[in-house]
């Protein structure tokens, strides 16, 4: 029995633990979820909840005449600021991703995966004492370590029918130029780490040629 329970942990067959929280670190039911949200006591990944506010969601931003290029520049500036500050203060970042979803539990979520668990723990402690954009930062350790399982494969293929309210991650891409700049900077600072993986939010290629696989129930 113990072996069976271990094999289904965090899957749709698990009626005790929430598979969405296990895979994505967020669940649309929040504290009202009928299944357990097992918050990790250690992890390489941290979640900064709802940190990014897109221009069209920002009451202080004039978006009437904003072009896609201008919107991308705003996002790139945000991404670079967070990435550079977190890596310089807390430690080497393996990847950083920002959700482009619209659901309250995912909108603007920033996931940062550090190389070391100790750095992630330090980041959570320090960031929870910080403010960003006039709002307090809410940071926590996240169970997400494999973003391939957390991301919507249909979205990556341009086939997601749920739009921004999909319960799997729709990642917002950064520009190719920024991607090269950030990860080359890190490579020079920390050396060529075999464990380093670039952000799945890199530009242009976020819709990959992969066959969609079943995800189970999307509550």
Describe these PLM feature segments.
Residues 1-219:
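Cys/His Zn-binding finger modules involved in RNA regulation
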